[in-house]
Amino acid sequence: MLAKVISSKNSLPILDCFLFQVANNVMTITASDSDNVIKSVIDLTECEGEGEFCIPNKVILDALKELPEQPLTLDVTPDSYAVKIVYQNGLYNFTAQSAEDYPRTQSMTDAANSIMIPATVLIDNISRSLFATANDELRPIMNGVYFDLTPDALAIVASDGHKLVRNKNFSIKSETPASFNLPKKPANLLKNILTKDGGDVLIKFDDRNAEIKYNDGVLNCRLIDGRYPNYNSVIPTDNPSQTTVDRRALLSALRRVLPFASESSQLVRLHMENGRFEVSSEDIDFATSAKEQLSCEYTGAPMSIGFKGSSLMEVLSNLSSDQVVIMLADPSRAGIIVPAEQPEDEDVLMLIMPMLLNE
């Protein structure tokens, strides 16, 4: 997992290496790309001496990836940096590098803001949000996962301007409002590193950096600078048309109908009326079309609305509830999709912008 931090194009050659630090029967392994630094701590069964050294990531990974799980003995000569790794049936010999030039990270000060989040909550919220982040070089502020801590709740938000995810957790709050914007790379790293039985995660942050401590390691990262847009202002609050439908059934219908939509627009049409939910698509250029009906619970006047099919499928795929509620105001305003049953102490909301229908 540490190897995923290391960039293929590092500005400093030493960052192609892992930093090994041995002290007090503990070995700390560090990987960095200058913006993100991950440290993992390993308890040693036996240790003689202390010190630090660097090993190129390709050397150590190629050496160890073919070995089955077993104890290893690592012997390093301080003067020459000669390394010998002894395993059950053999050994490796190679040369390490001095750790003198490896960049060091500074711990956050006590003045930094902090949040304590259960690992399972953080994993679920980041996993639900990452698909909605942007890849926009002109608006880098939209490329991250935004954490907004208020006296009422912690909101974890992501948006690319076409779709939006807002996760509210009411058990995590702060009298002093604070926020930070976590870049996509460290967010992905956290999603893959953390385990759901990993206890609580402590996040300390200031205007520029964050330090995230979990059960057996720490991630330091640079934050995205800038003011995040007012995400609440784009969420319609008056949505008289509401459809409750089986999430998996709707996903399956979209998979069948979407191939018949225009390849360029991927427009699918949803029509709701008197307990009838119709999903359809059409490609006028190739004279193809598809239509499928689902059962639903619907309140409101008959309505047709268009969405980009692939985006709607992404939204539905990142929810886990059996049923979802689609809330609409009119065909020109954003649609809101929420789980029919919200997770405990949470309010999960996804928003998707509509597309113009050719009536």
Q: Which residues make up each language-model segment?
A:
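Structural preference for solvent-exposed beta-strand-turn elements
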Residues: 1-359
